[in-house]
Amino acid sequence: KVSESPISLSVKNLPLTFTLQEPEAVFVGSSSAIIPVLYDGSDIDLVQFSYLNPEGHKVNCTSTVLSAEENLYQVKISVEATNKPVKIEASLSGGLKTAATSIPVLTPEFTISAEEYDVWAKKAIVKLTAADPQYQDAVNRYAVLYTNSTGQWVHAASTHEGNVHTLTGLSPDTRYQIKGTCNNEQENVNYHGDCTIRTETAAGVPNGDFEDLTQTISVSDINQGGRWSPTIGNPTYQSTCSFTINEPVGWASVNAKTSNTSATNQMSWFVCPSTYNTTLSWTGKVPGIPIFGGGGTDTPDIYKNLTAKNGSNAMVVRNVAWDENGTTPPPHYKTRGSAYYYSENVPSIANRSAGKLFLGSYSYSGNSESYNEGTSFSSRPSTMKGWYKYTPDNNDGSETGVISVTLLNRETILASGTINLTAASDYTEFTVPLVYTVTDKKANLLKIMIASSNHASYSQSEETATIKTTDYYSRYESNSRGATLTIDNLNFIYE
């Protein structure tokens, strides 16, 4: 059958040449690129461009012809340049003919800088600054950092906010080179920002295991309590005690006050160490009585079987009563066996003090005391840990031991932390987090104060008013003491 209707034919001529040439690289963060297009058609505006965004979606581009030379056109298109090559597609006549290329990306120039106080033992805070401000957002978004401390570059663990990056997982006391890139997801990577830092040392607590000791007190045959007699009318006798105390090198106590070897009355009621080592030597001596006998020497029970958490020595701080000018109690007469050869008369004792152990030095003379706290220290730990035992006094059930840590730069407090230690019969681990309120200074001074009581004070009258002790008298001990804190194995943690 032959149609009588006219037939209309439409013929579309496609150009023989339509290709995209390799474009020049653009900086990460660029919003446009220039694409060389080889095209022998009559109207370059018929070519439509698109690119794949970071989510993989096709985005249409705006385009402008910048120049044309014979069949080669330089076309500027809108893009979003990320950290990997930008895939470009050009289409003609509704997609009947397409061409594709990829735009390589370059890391825009930037610097990496770090303030000295921003470099810690295991972390460092660095700032990335683009040479051209228009690329700062791209640097903030795409920069990846690498470190080198051994001759090999490794991807650095870091977090960032804006252009400030915090590198973590660093090694203490180590020199690092740092560089960065924004185009790490393409084959040809370029880097910028060479920077060199040295991390702080991860210094430990000075002599924190209390193993390095020096002798501070050696007392021989002072009166242990008052005089006593087994029967009324018999001669009276005097028990004595001898002891040697060692303290950790670099640390100080208030023993010069509580165990004052210059006190007018050298008696155990008035001269009582508030700090001592678990490896101390202490011997009580009871004189023998003619005919009856019953004398002997021994160590008081409180000083027996003392142990350290690790190593050979721990330190003990305790509340004690003391008196620089104490008066001897009257003799005590009794009619009991030799196990009771001691005086039960308790004198009036003027003062009560908490035991203290602290970094620094201490002096006492004529009712005047001086604390020189702290030691040179240039690291910045995040936490102090240690082990303790604590026995409160029966007269103050709410009492606790206290440990405080302070890091300073001269007079400026950088960080501090305090913990109250409650009753514990066995060694128990404790943690003191250090809260930093100033981070734009380096540390140069460390203070640690360990006290047997939360009533501890720099005022002697306040301590005497608030600290409780219990009187103890037995065959080999005569003193008034209270809450007791044993401490060992102090160490710093760095994060």
PLM ranges: what are they?
Residues 1-4, 92-100, 185-192:
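Short, exposed coil/turn segments at beta-strand boundaries within extracellular/luminal domains
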Residues 14-22, 107-115:
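Proline-enriched interdomain boundary motifs that mark the N-terminal boundary
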Residues 24-31, 116-121:
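Short, solvent-exposed loop/linker segments at the N-terminal edge
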Residues 42-49, 131-149, 395-400, 441-445:
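Solvent-exposed loop/turn segments flanking beta-strands in beta-repeat/beta-sandwich domains
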Residues 69, 77-85, 167-175:
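Surface-exposed, short loops/turns at beta-strand junctions within beta-sandwich domains
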Residues 170-186:
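Beta-strand-rich modules
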Residues 194-383, 400-431, 445-495:
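Aromatic (Trp/Tyr/Phe) and Gly/Pro-enriched flexible surface segments
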Residues 390-399, 423:
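Extended, low-complexity, turn-rich repeat/linker tracts enriched in Gly/Pro/Ser/Thr and Asp/Glu
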